[in-house]
């Protein structure tokens, strides 16, 4: 087809579909004995887009992975946290099953938003990201500490939906099938059990602002970002279809739970004194009840909007070593792939992996701190390696992690000599 701007001689050309002349439209495209204008092309595009959305607003029943399949995928990327993975798999499956059946069901199904409780670096954010990637739905993260009530300086809670829309090019239907992860949710807890008479811009007030968004409302979002103003056209997003996952470390929550559990167990010389070895912190956190979260500082209405609670354990040394080498995207595999691009083999010895895990434990950063340790150890080598010829292998051992030596470089001729000598 060709772009026609003029007819033969002075005779004007007309769009075969709408009848407009070439002078009334921007472009007129010619085919064999027919013409179509740019306006009709745009209209056809809109019709096709609408048709596609109607055909597949939510994946078919066969396409929605069952809880066991979701759990299996999480196992490929996340080490440990078995109960949390089970809880998440069921909650996510039920959420998308609810979206599919909402029109057919006589009984209205409630939302199953999720609260993840676990120490820093235990995998809360990574679990949410992995789920969204597996389900192929839009995903965005927000930091609860940056949120404020409407009218105050800071981020409105509706900015969360704005970010989700940005992730899917402002496709409202796609956004309504998305997952939102709100981190540091424990940081907006009320500082005491008694409601404050002063305004709490980033605490209880934000909880109140998040209530409707998480439960389900039609949020009016400006498409171009920024604060709302009357001249803007708003996009209407139904948040009842969006899955919200909130996460936080909840430091000190174990003491609140212990206090509840110890009530009525007796005091004085005959009372049993529980040591830390008898009741580990992870086991205590797993016994969390809504009343504990209220005492911690979350308002009851907000807790009610997060009916599914999953607790994550603090990662021990063995778990960190597994994280370094077992998952599909394990750090050692990632760095090995980088070195392979230079035709160099990278080897982490067992004592090196243990030393990295111990370092992360000492820093109390969990899995989150592993990458910075490995990056720091390999930085010098990655800087020099592209300029050095003949390197076949790089070996990292315990002394390298301790900073006592540099990674060992083995050259191609050294390897040949070793192989020839039978070593």
From Swiss-Prot:
Protein name: ATP-dependent Clp protease ATP-binding subunit ClpX
Highest taxon in the source lineage: Bacteria
Binding site for Zn(2+): 15, 18, 37, 40
Function: ATP-dependent specificity component of the Clp protease. It directs the protease to specific substrates. Can perform chaperone functions in the absence of ClpP.
Residues that hold ATP according to the record: 119-126
BP-aspect Gene Ontology terms: cell division; proteolysis involved in protein catabolic process
Xref: Pfam families: AAA_2, ClpB_D2-small, zf-C4_ClpX
Cellular component terms per the entry's GO annotation: HslUV protease complex
The ClpX-type ZB domain, residue ranges: 3-56
GO molecular function: ATP binding; ATP hydrolysis activity; ATP-dependent protein folding chaperone; protein dimerization activity; unfolded protein binding; zinc ion binding
UniProt feature coiled coil, ranges: none
UniProt-listed InterPro entries: AAA+_ATPase, ATP-dep_Clp_protease_ClpX, ATPase_AAA_core, Clp_ATPase_C, Clp_protease_ATP-bd_su_ClpX, ClpX_bact, P-loop_NTPase, Znf_CppX_C4
Entry's transmembrane regions: none
Native species: Idiomarina loihiensis (strain ATCC BAA-735 / DSM 15497 / L2-TR)
Keyword line: ATP-binding, Chaperone, Metal-binding, Nucleotide-binding, Zinc
UniProt subunit comment: Component of the ClpX-ClpP complex. Forms a hexameric ring that, in the presence of ATP, binds to fourteen ClpP subunits assembled into a disk-like structure with a central cavity, resembling the structure of eukaryotic proteasomes.
UniProt similarity note: Belongs to the ClpX chaperone family.
């Amino acid at each position: 087809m060709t772009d026609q701007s003029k007819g033969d001689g002075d005779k004007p050309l007309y769009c075969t579909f709408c009848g407009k002349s070439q002078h009334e439209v921007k472009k007129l495209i010619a085919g064999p004995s027919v013409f179509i204008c740019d306006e009709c092309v745009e209209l056809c595009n809109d019709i096709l887009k609408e048709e596609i959305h109607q055909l597949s607003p939510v994946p078919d029943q066969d396409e929605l992975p069952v809880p066991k399949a979701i759990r299996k995928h999480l196992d490929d990327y996340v080490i440990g946290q078995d109960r949390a993975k089970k809880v998440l798999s069921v909650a996510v499956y039920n959420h998308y099953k609810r979206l599919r059946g909402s029109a057919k069901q006589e009984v209205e199904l409630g939302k199953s938003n999720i609260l993840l409780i676990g120490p820093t670096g235990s995998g809360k954010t990574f679990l949410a990201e992995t789920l969204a990637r597996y389900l192929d739905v839009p995903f965005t993260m927000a930091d609860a500490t940056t949120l404020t009530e409407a009218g105050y300086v800071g981020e409105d809670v509706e900015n969360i939906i704005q970010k989700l829309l940005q992730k899917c090019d402002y496709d409202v239907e796609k956004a309504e099938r998305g997952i939102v992860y709100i981190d540091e949710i424990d940081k907006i807890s009320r500082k005491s059990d008694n409601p404050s008479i002063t305004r709490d811009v980033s605490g209880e007030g934000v909880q109140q602002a998040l209530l409707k968004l998480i439960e389900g409302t039609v949020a009016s979002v400006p498409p171009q970002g920024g604060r709302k103003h009357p001249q803007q056209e708003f996009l209407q997003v139904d948040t009842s279809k969006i899955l919200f996952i909130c996460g936080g470390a909840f430091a000190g929550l174990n003491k609140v739970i212990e206090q509840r559990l110890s009530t009525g167990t007796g005091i004085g010389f005959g009372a049993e004194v529980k040591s830390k070895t008898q009741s580990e912190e992870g086991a205590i956190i797993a016994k969390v009840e809504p009343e504990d979260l209220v005492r911690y500082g979350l308002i009851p209405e907000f807790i009610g909007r997060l009916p599914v609670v999953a607790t994550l354990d603090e990662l021990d040394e063995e778990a960190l070593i597994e994280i370094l080498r077992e998952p599909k995207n394990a750090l050692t595999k990632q760095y090995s792939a980088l070195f392979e691009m230079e035709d160099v083999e990278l080897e982490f010895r067992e004592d090196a992996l243990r030393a990295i895990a111990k370092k992360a434990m000492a820093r109390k950063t969990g899995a989150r701190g592993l990458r910075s340790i490995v990056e720091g150890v390999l930085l010098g080598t990655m800087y020099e390696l592209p300029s050095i010829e003949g390197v076949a292998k790089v070996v990292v051992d315990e002394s390298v992690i301790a900073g006592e030596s540099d990674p060992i470089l083995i050259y191609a001729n050294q390897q040949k000599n070793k192989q020839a000598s039978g070593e």
